[in-house]
Amino acid sequence: MALSDADVQKQIKHMMAFIEQEANEKAEEIDAKAEEEFNIEKGRLVQTQRLKIMEYYEKKEKQIEQQKKIQMSNLMNQARLKVLRARDDLITDLLNEAKQRLSKVVKDTTRYQVLLDGLVLQGLYQLLEPRMIVRCRKQDFPLVKAAVQKAIPMYKIATKNDVDVQIDQESYLPEDIAGGVEIYNGDRKIKVSNTLESRLDLIAQQMMPEVRGALFGANANRKFLD
């Protein structure tokens, strides 16, 4: 039985509606899949950027922390240096004060004579030369001469050797030093400095650990004494 034109048109419309519906469903499926893939990619990009930002700020935080440590270390070192300078300045002031007090010793002639006797004899024992020359300040010449005269027989008895000791009257020690003597061997190549300043410096070096301990207390980090 042949289909009428109306039936044919009806079937065509039905087929077109089916095709259109299928096309719409396919398009919706594609859109949904594309949106899903977009959301996944967007999430991945967001996560990647978030990780990069976190990594950047973690790196910055570490750099800032490192800079803080360096600055703190520098500040501590500067503070430590200031303390050390202050300590050295205090010790220097004490030594300068001690040097100024040496002039009081020299003014006491009796006390100064005893001191010169010891310095001259000690210098002779240190050199142990057959001929020695003593230098002193011009104003100390009489006292040093007396000290040499006392020292020669004591030296001879102790060493069982003769000795010729002369006082240099051509080249005296500077008048601005506190006092004491310098003793040379015969050709002046060897010298023993027994001026009051040199003796004070020597004593200061030997007693520096005790001085620091008395002024500032013991240093727990110091393994050896100066």
Curated annotation (Swiss-Prot):
<comment type="similarity">
    <text>Belongs to the V-ATPase E subunit family.</text>
</comment>
<keyword id="KW-0770">Synapse</keyword>
<dbReference type="GO" id="GO:0046961">
    <property type="term" value="F:proton-transporting ATPase activity, rotational mechanism"/>
</dbReference>
<dbReference type="GO" id="GO:0000221">
    <property type="term" value="C:vacuolar proton-transporting V-type ATPase, V1 domain"/>
</dbReference>
<dbReference type="GO" id="GO:0016241">
    <property type="term" value="P:regulation of macroautophagy"/>
</dbReference>
<dbReference type="GO" id="GO:0005765">
    <property type="term" value="C:lysosomal membrane"/>
</dbReference>
<protein>
    <recommendedName>
        <fullName>V-type proton ATPase subunit E 1</fullName>
    </recommendedName>
</protein>
<dbReference type="GO" id="GO:0030665">
    <property type="term" value="C:clathrin-coated vesicle membrane"/>
</dbReference>
<dbReference type="GO" id="GO:0051117">
    <property type="term" value="F:ATPase binding"/>
</dbReference>
<dbReference type="GO" id="GO:0005768">
    <property type="term" value="C:endosome"/>
</dbReference>
<keyword id="KW-0597">Phosphoprotein</keyword>
<dbReference type="GO" id="GO:0070062">
    <property type="term" value="C:extracellular exosome"/>
</dbReference>
<keyword id="KW-0007">Acetylation</keyword>
<dbReference type="GO" id="GO:0016324">
    <property type="term" value="C:apical plasma membrane"/>
</dbReference>
<dbReference type="GO" id="GO:0030672">
    <property type="term" value="C:synaptic vesicle membrane"/>
</dbReference>
<dbReference type="Pfam" id="PF01991">
    <property type="entry name" value="vATP-synt_E"/>
</dbReference>
<keyword id="KW-0225">Disease variant</keyword>
<dbReference type="InterPro" id="IPR002842">
    <property type="entry name" value="ATPase_V1_Esu"/>
</dbReference>
<keyword id="KW-0813">Transport</keyword>
<feature type="modified residue" description="Phosphotyrosine">
    <location>
        <position position="56"/>
    </location>
</feature>
<dbReference type="InterPro" id="IPR038495">
    <property type="entry name" value="ATPase_E_C"/>
</dbReference>
<keyword id="KW-1003">Cell membrane</keyword>
<dbReference type="GO" id="GO:0097401">
    <property type="term" value="P:synaptic vesicle lumen acidification"/>
</dbReference>
<dbReference type="GO" id="GO:1902600">
    <property type="term" value="P:proton transmembrane transport"/>
</dbReference>
<dbReference type="GO" id="GO:0005829">
    <property type="term" value="C:cytosol"/>
</dbReference>
<keyword id="KW-0406">Ion transport</keyword>
<comment type="function">
    <text>Subunit of the V1 complex of vacuolar(H+)-ATPase (V-ATPase), a multisubunit enzyme composed of a peripheral complex (V1) that hydrolyzes ATP and a membrane integral complex (V0) that translocates protons. V-ATPase is responsible for acidifying and maintaining the pH of intracellular compartments and in some cell types, is targeted to the plasma membrane, where it is responsible for acidifying the extracellular environment.</text>
</comment>
<feature type="modified residue" description="N-acetylalanine">
    <location>
        <position position="2"/>
    </location>
</feature>
<comment type="subunit">
    <text>V-ATPase is a heteromultimeric enzyme made up of two complexes: the ATP-hydrolytic V1 complex and the proton translocation V0 complex. The V1 complex consists of three catalytic AB heterodimers that form a heterohexamer, three peripheral stalks each consisting of EG heterodimers, one central rotor including subunits D and F, and the regulatory subunits C and H. The proton translocation complex V0 consists of the proton transport subunit a, a ring of proteolipid subunits c9c'', rotary subunit d, subunits e and f, and the accessory subunits ATP6AP1/Ac45 and ATP6AP2/PRR.</text>
</comment>
<dbReference type="GO" id="GO:0005902">
    <property type="term" value="C:microvillus"/>
</dbReference>
<dbReference type="GO" id="GO:0016469">
    <property type="term" value="C:proton-transporting two-sector ATPase complex"/>
</dbReference>
<keyword id="KW-0472">Membrane</keyword>
<keyword id="KW-0968">Cytoplasmic vesicle</keyword>
<keyword id="KW-0375">Hydrogen ion transport</keyword>
